[in-house]
């Protein structure tokens, strides 16, 4: 089996359906005997340029190890699902399990926001 990195962008109005989509896609990977090494839901983010007159999309990143047939099925599913705006599937040489730069940057900002919030509360007193 080969390793793949999959990123897909979902229409922002369909954000509530993303957990179901993720469950469906990971289910098809596991059903074929594959493995999900990394799964990150980046949430709604600003697009670099408008796609179908939209300025935001819901991003999902998956690193999986599956046979080629499953990748073909996923790509077909992405192509015919109107909620998926864009998708990208890349073959990788090995399993990637560490946090992506997007996830790492988000986790770095989180403690800073908590510190700023605490400073604001102290200033009010």
From Swiss-Prot:
InterPro entries: Ribosomal_bS6, Ribosomal_bS6_CS, Ribosomal_bS6_sf, Ribosomal_S6_plastid/chlpt, Transl_elong_EF1B/ribsomal_bS6. GO terms for biological process: translation. Residues 104-113 have a biased composition (Basic and acidic residues). PROSITE patterns: RIBOSOMAL_S6 (PS01048). One of its GO terms (molecular function) is structural constituent of ribosome. Residues 97-125 are annotated as: Disordered. Keywords: Ribonucleoprotein, Ribosomal protein, RNA-binding, rRNA-binding. It comes from the Bacteria. Signal peptide: none annotated. One of its GO terms (cellular component) is cytosolic small ribosomal subunit. Residues 116-125 have a biased composition (Acidic residues). Belongs to the bacterial ribosomal protein bS6 family. Binds together with bS18 to 16S ribosomal RNA. This is Small ribosomal subunit protein bS6.
């Amino acid at each position: 089996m080969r390793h793949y990195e999959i990123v897909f962008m979902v229409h922002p109005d369909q954000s509530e359906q993303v957990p179901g989509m993720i469950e469906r896609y990971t289910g098809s990977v596991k059903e074929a005997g594959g493995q999900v090494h990394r799964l990150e839901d980046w949430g709604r983010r600003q697009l670099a340029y408008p796609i179908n007159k939209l300025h935001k999309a819901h991003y999902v990143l998956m690193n999986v190890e599956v046979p080629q047939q499953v990748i073909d099925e996923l790509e077909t599913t992405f192509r015919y699902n109107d909620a998926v705006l864009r998708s990208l599937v890349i073959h990788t040489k090995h399993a990637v399990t560490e946090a992506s730069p997007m996830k790492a940057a988000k986790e770095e900002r989180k403690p800073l926001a908590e510190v700023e919030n605490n400073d604001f509360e102290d200033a009010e007193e």
